[in-house]
Amino acid sequence: MLLQRLSDRHDHASFRETHQWSIENPGDFWREAWNDLGIAGDPGSTAMTGQGFSYTRWFPEGSLNVVNTLLAGKPDDEVLVALTEDGPRRSFTREQLRGEVAACAAALEASGVRAGDRVAAWMPHVPETVIYALGALSMGAVVSTASIDFGPSALIDRFGQIEPTVLLVPARSTYAGKVADHASVLDEILLQLPSVTTLVVAGGGEARVSFEDWLAPHRGAPLAPVDLPFDHPGFILFSSGTTGKPKCIVHRAAGVLLKVLSEQGYHLDVRPSDRMLYATTCGWMMWNWLVMGLGRGATIVLVDGSPGFPDLGRLWSITAGESLSFLGVSAALIDTWRKAELDPKDFGTLESLRTIASTGSPLGPEGYDWVAESISPDIVVASIAGGTDLCGCLVLGVATEAVRRGEIGGPALGLDVTVVDSEGHQVSAGVEGELVCRTPFPSTPLEFWGDTNGARMRSAYFDRFEGIWAHGDFAKSTREGGFVILGRLDATLNAKGVRIGTAEIYRIVQSIPGIQDSLAVAQPHDGDSRIVLFVVTTDELDEALETRIRQELRSQASPRHVPSLIVRAPAVPRTRSGKMTELAVADIVAARAERDTSSLANPESLEWFRQWAKGSRDL
């Protein structure tokens, strides 16, 4: 076990000792991680320079290309498997994947792409997306992916900011048995993305360049990843769009690789020859996280479509059929299985399964119990928490310790993670506060795209506490060294484990005739959470208007943006400066202690929400 070997090498008796060493000696730790994890490339003579988040540089003399690590190994090993709802199983050996990536890199170069250029993909969770991303990374381009369930408006909000020159899209996609043809929206997307000079369509499409035809002239090209500095950008991920258009978070490819492999290798005991699946889309950071699993020598399994189609046992059938050793899902899905009294063993033998990872929202003790009782008490349940901001985890499982139900194992190695009060002072175990990190790490964002003076990035993470990364999670630590995540501190909606930005909802809803104002919150409900949308309307909220709201959100954003309840309200609370105060309403509907409302211009508006909340549990 990699973590045990690290501890033994330094004569540490516990994970706590190893973690303390890693934060006191970050340069030594990350250099050892580079070597332990088999990162291909030259780290240089210095692992880090400077101090603090603003001035630390990682491997300033380093030179590498992450693709050399991701595609290293025996040529005949199966490394990628893809399963969809309605298509055949597809698989690639390492040599086949290397060939596809080489052809893609050559096609990108022939399309005029150079190192540092942005390329984007609006795609399902299929091999073409992985091949495209690796091809871009191999030549130093910056890749950004978005889920196919984003509508044109949400897509333009993201890609419009970064101005990609090449865009990969699908001809069609399938979810829950329904086939969507995307040809009708491609002209609209291209009209609003004038930077795109090459549109490539996976799965064909008349009058468009297919992915296969795009690669065809370049088949047989050698794979020749370009060595790049450690700080070279590789990914742009997007925030949830809480306070306007989503923030474009620029990540070093090398930083993400090193951070994620440290999580998979040390914390979660992902081993070469493991078979791992994470139920995700291309719009979630867990897609990037899963792809990095290639660097552990693992076989990654892509599953596109609904995890509940044709039945709730789909992922368990795949776990058995593909002999998975690692299965990653959302906490909400585990709760769905538990409430449905699903028996995973009905779908095949699960003897190869060692680890179930859970993220997206807190996993309660009942979820841990369900895994132990329905599968095996020997299964490692690894709840993990972090986010898009670091493309990795702040807290996660600890491979050398027993699982403790209802809590996350410990802080990530190399990260000084703790819980603080509103003044930034560390609080004792069991006391609720804000989750923070007090030391820089390699996957700290390089920048926000377009944030020329760094003001937006400082505001996002460092304005609350000087020199400390404020993550925005409400949490508490435990006496055993673990953590319990209690939810988000900001206004981001978290419905069924998926983060939804309210600003995206408002832009769409408030463009509908008859809607004067709107406010969306997540409300705890039936052991999970649901989105409640309050609207201020010119006339009554009738069935036709409610249907229109749902249709517009589904088509322009995604099905996940559609609220469980739409309720007419007389007014939305706002501050004197005109800012909406979602958190005040969120506290009321969640039955939490209300915060100071002295800054409100219309505090009387909250009384209506208090009365509504009293009777809302039965809705």
Please place each PLM-identified region on the residue numbering:
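Conserved ATP/PPi-binding loop(s) of AMP-dependent carboxylate-activating enzymes
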Residues: 411-414, 425-462, 500
